[in-house]
């Protein structure tokens, strides 16, 4: 913290920093704001701003110049309150305060400072938090010399531009790499898993019986609780329903329940989506989520996992299917090489899948790291307290 202050002190060179209420150092130009229903907007090239972003492009404008837009209500996040930068001609609706600095306050300095500020103490209301004009006017703003404001803006703008450039480059490069790796994975998957006359061909019903969990009634679920309950809409995603541990333990003992490593399959909606069951306590919607009870004497579960991605579920090309019935599932043919060869194939396909996933996960991570770098320096440069 000492180094942080020293860095800022070097910029200040002994100059004092005044704190002023926002309405003393900035203009609040809300009078021209005008909300327009989407059905009444005339399409054009002028950005139409709402609380969080540009909502449309219209003809006409309410403001022209450089302004900071602060959500009045409807901010997507209260912790990271919505602050936008508007330049040129634009249209502002009544969900944003429109502000620009007076002679002692650099507009971009105000923008960066507000993006680093905690707005929660200034908000009124619970269900739809609101920043009233009266509270906005009271927000304390640090006023270092304009030369210091300009230098801080120069540094933070450079970091913002670097983050944007890096995001664009990473997205372009990694998307191309992702497409290439995905195609490689699909090529080898098709080559290694398709029907081979040299291998034994069986039906999935020969691998093991089709299983599903016991039906869970709506009144047995809650929005929070002990055991996540996955429905077809949340399969492979975040659960939005839960069941009690008592019910889970009872049903787990009495009825079918997957083993760790079993491959769960979606039997409605998008047919054939898969999840490798990790063994964690959870429950799954009956008939919509099924699995083959596989003892792995004939087929490895991981081999099934990769096979399901190319399986033909008994429908014509271009056709649709509302449900994968057990009989359809059991009749799907699969080529099974010896277990040793299955291990080799799984090893190859796992590597391709890992490479593909590493790009998918790496892109947001790299962007997040760049954003954190900007936030670190923003905090360092704007911590006048």
Swiss-Prot record:
For the keyword Repeat, the answer is: yes
CDD domains linked: RMtype1_S_Aco12261I-TRD2-CR2, RMtype1_S_LlaA17I_TRD2-CR2_like
Q: GO:BP terms for this protein?
A: DNA restriction-modification system
**Signal sequence region:** none
What the record says about family reads: Belongs to the type-I restriction system S methylase family.
UniProt domain comment: Contains two DNA recognition domains, each specifying recognition of one of the two defined components of the target sequence.
Name this protein carries in UniProt: Putative type I restriction enzyme specificity subunit S.HindORF215P
Q: Which organism is it from?
A: Haemophilus influenzae (strain ATCC 51907 / DSM 11121 / KW20 / Rd)
């Amino acid at each position: 913290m000492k180094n942080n202050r020293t860095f800022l002190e070097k910029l200040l060179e002994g100059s004092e920093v005044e704190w002023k209420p926002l309405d003393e150092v900035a203009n609040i130009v809300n009078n021209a704001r005008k909300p327009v229903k989407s059905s009444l907007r005339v399409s054009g090239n002028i950005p139409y701003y709402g609380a969080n972003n540009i909502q449309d492009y219209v003809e006409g404008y309410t403001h022209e110049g450089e302004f900071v837009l602060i959500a009045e209500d409807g901010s997507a996040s209260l912790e990271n309150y919505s602050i936008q930068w508007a330049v040129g001609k634009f249209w502002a609706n009544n969900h944003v305060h429109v502000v620009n600095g007076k002679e002692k306050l650099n507009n971009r300095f105000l923008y960066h400072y507000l993006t680093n500020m905690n707005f929660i103490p200034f908000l009124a209301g619970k269900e739809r938090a609101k920043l009233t004009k009266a509270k906005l006017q009271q927000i304390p703003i640090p006023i270092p010399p304009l030369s210091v404001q300009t230098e801080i803006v120069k540094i933070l703008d450079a970091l913002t531009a670097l983050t944007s450039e890096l995001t664009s480059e990473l997205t372009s490069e990694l998307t191309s790499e992702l497409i290439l790796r995905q195609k490689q994975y699909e090529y080898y998957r098709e080559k290694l898993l398709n029907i081979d006359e040299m291998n034994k061909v069986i039906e999935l019903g020969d691998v093991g019986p089709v299983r599903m969990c016991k039906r869970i009634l709506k009144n047995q679920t809650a929005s929070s609780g002990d055991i996540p309950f996955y429905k077809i809409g949340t399969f492979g995603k975040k659960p939005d329903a839960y069941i009690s541990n008592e019910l889970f333990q009872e049903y787990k003992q009495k009825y079918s329940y997957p083993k760790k490593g079993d491959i769960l399959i979606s039997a409605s909606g998008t047919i054939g989506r898969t999840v490798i069951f990790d063994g964690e306590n959870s429950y799954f919607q009956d008939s919509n989520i099924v699995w083959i009870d596989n003892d792995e004497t004939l087929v490895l579960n991981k081999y099934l996992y990769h096979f399901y991605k190319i399986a033909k579920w008994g429908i014509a090309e271009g056709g649709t299917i509302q449900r994968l019935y057990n009989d359809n599932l059991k009749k799907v043919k699969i080529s099974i090489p010896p277990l040793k060869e299955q291990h080799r194939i799984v090893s190859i396909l796992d590597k391709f899948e890992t490479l593909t996933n590493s790009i998918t996960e790496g892109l947001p991570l790299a962007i997040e790291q760049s954003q954190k770098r900007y936030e670190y320096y923003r905090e360092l440069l704007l911590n006048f307290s």
